[in-house]
Amino acid sequence: HLSLRRQRQMCIRDRCKYVLITDEKGGVINDPILLKLAEDHFWLSIADSDVLLWAKGVAVHSNMDVQICEPDVSPLQLQGPKSREILRQAFGDIPADLKYYRFIEYVWDGIPLVISRTGWSSELGYEIFLRDGEKGDLLWEHIMKVGAPLGLKPGHTSSIRRIEAAMLSYNADMTTADNPYELGMDRLVVCDGSFDFIGKKSLQKIKKEGVKRNFVGLEISGEPLIGSNDERWSVIKNREKVGYITSA
C-alpha cells in the first residue's frame, strides 16, 4: 500500500493490474503491471526505472515483514494479430484462451513459465515470463519454429503502434516530474481510501487544486517522419513555449 496507488485487495489471484508507483510529491516513479501469484506473492513487471532499490527502501523504512527481490525471470513478448494462434500451437488452448489481463502459471516440457494476456502494443498479444534462465534458448527456438509458418519474426516494440494506442513510455513520456492527473491517469488513483500510500497527501492536494498542464495527443501535418524523435521538441505559440512533444 505504501508504494502502489490502487488497493491491493482489488487484485485477484491470476489477474494483472496496471498500477502506478509515486513519490512523496505525487510524481510517477514507475507504471508496472502487478501480477498476483498468491495471497502473499506479487510480481511487478516494471518499466524503465529502478524500482528495486525504491521498494527495498520503503520496506526498511516501514518495518514491514516483506521480502523484496529480483527473481530469475526473463520476459518475452509475443504480439500481433496471429499471436493467439502461435501461442496455441506452442503451448495449447489453456494459455491461448486467456482473457485480457489474466495470467497462468504453466509448465512446458519441464520449463516453468508465467504467461499473461498483456503486452506493450496496440495488438493482440501475450507476455511469456521464463522462470529458468538456463532454458532461454530452448524456449526461443520452440516459439520461432512454431511461429515461422505464420510469419513470426524477431523485432522490437513499434513506437508508432504504442503512440497511436496512447501507451506512455516511462522516461520518454513521463518521469517523477509528472503526476497521474497531468497524465490523464486519475482513474488509477484512489485518494479517498482508508489506506495510506506515499504521495497520497500531495495527490489529494493536486486533485483539489487542479493541474496547470495536461498530457494530450497531437496530430502533425506534413510529410511522415523518418523516425522517432531523440529529444523533446518545443511547441511554440506566438513566440512563447507552451509545451513540448515527448514522442513522435
Locations of regions flagged by a protein language model:
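Hydrophobic beta-strand positions
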Residues: 3, 21, 234-237
